């Protein structure tokens, strides 16, 4: 077993072989083939090219070297084109800290039965006077950077559940084509994570409308992994066992504590929102997340809200500003 597999259990190594075409005997050769392609993109600054880093891109693209390199190039190109987003991508950045403390994103301690990490977004918590959409996106990207250091998650992947309960039409009207495209480029096109599913629950009609509008920007593979459950959670439980879910989603775990992930990343900074030190989390150091204690069963239904690379693949920030910045949904 190569040192790059250190810490992986035999079952996960076998899963990597069967599902991702990962071969321990040719691992270093596969990595070097991707590294050798870097010279073909002198327009991009590849700031990290070590074996462990390149390996996560190979896993994200099932060891197709060309696709892995394209993803690697888009990862750094996205950061070059959006320098302000990544200038201080740390948990103690004021904007990121506010987003984390408001639960963007939530991260469950328990994984699902396939070993996937479960991320939560409670959309109605978006206070637009407090958090910009970009800062929420930055907090999500930082969280993914932290989590993807875990080799088990590089192979098993992630699940995202978005609860749209009480997400108002007014909030939805603030979502513009440019910021939605920024999120799609950052999460779908430029990050080495395997997303096994994106689950919408309690989505109102205007989220269906938003999803229809952004569908053309989604890859076919992404579209097939988006599930619209509405307010009946039986279909969600067919894909994610209730034992892995908090009570908000009809699961057997206690209600999700919005501060769990923020406390993990911020450490002693969590309780003081006005002081920002350099002792908090960054993308290099990984801390252990405290375990969550199981609770009692909860109902199966939730109330519906009354109130979704080649050069030039990614756009420069100034180009986005020149795009249509009108909301996708307009208030009367």
UniProtKB/Swiss-Prot annotation:
GO molecular function term, any single one: phosphatidylinositol-3,5-bisphosphate binding
Cell compartments where the protein resides: Golgi apparatus, trans-Golgi network membrane; Early endosome membrane; Cytoplasmic vesicle, Clathrin-coated vesicle
SUPFAM superfamilies found in the cross-reference section: CRAL/TRIO domain, CRAL/TRIO N-terminal domain
Annotated stretches, region: Disordered: 300-332
PANTHER family: ALPHA-TOCOPHEROL TRANSFER PROTEIN-RELATED, CLAVESIN-1
Function in brief: Required for normal morphology of late endosomes and/or lysosomes in neurons. Binds phosphatidylinositol 3,5-bisphosphate (PtdIns(3,5)P2).
Keyword Membrane found: yes
Name of this protein: Clavesin-1
């Amino acid at each position: 077993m190569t040192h790059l597999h250190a810490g992986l259990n035999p079952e996960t190594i076998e899963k990597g072989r069967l599902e991702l075409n990962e071969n321990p005997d040719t691992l270093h050769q596969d990595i070097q083939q991707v590294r050798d392609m870097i010279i073909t993109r002198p327009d991009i600054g590849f700031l990290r090219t070590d074996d462990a880093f390149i390996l996560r891109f190979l896993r994200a693209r099932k060891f197709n070297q060309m696709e892995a390199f394209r993803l690697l190039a888009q990862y750094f190109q996205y950061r070059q084109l959006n320098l302000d987003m990544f200038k201080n991508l740390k948990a103690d950045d004021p904007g990121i800290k506010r987003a984390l403390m408001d639960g963007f994103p939530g991260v469950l301690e328990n994984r699902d039965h396939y070993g996937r990490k479960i991320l939560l977004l409670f959309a109605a918590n978006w206070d637009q006077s407090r958090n910009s959409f970009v800062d929420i996106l930055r907090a999500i990207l930082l969280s993914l950077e932290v989590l993807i250091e875990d080799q088990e998650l590089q192979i098993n992947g992630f699940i995202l559940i978005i609860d749209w309960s009480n997400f108002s039409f007014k909030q939805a009207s603030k979502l513009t084509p440019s910021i939605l495209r920024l999120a799609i480029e950052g999460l779908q096109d430029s990050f080495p994570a395997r997303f096994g599913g994106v689950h919408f629950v309690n989505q109102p009609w205007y989220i269906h409308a938003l999803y229809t509008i952004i569908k053309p920007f989604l890859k076919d593979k992404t579209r097939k992994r988006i599930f619209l459950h509405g307010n009946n959670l039986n279909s969600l439980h067919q894909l994610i066992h209730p034992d892995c879910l908090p009570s908000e989603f009809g699961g057997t775990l206690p209600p999700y504590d919005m501060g769990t992930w923020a406390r993990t990343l911020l450490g002693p900074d969590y309780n003081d929102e006005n002081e920002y030190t350099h002792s908090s989390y960054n993308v290099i150091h990984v801390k252990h997340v405290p375990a969550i204690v199981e609770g009692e069963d909860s109902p199966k239904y939730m109330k519906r809200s009354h109130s979704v690379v080649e050069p030039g693949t990614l756009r420069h920030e100034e180009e986005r500003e020149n795009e249509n910045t009108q909301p996708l949904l307009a208030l009367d």
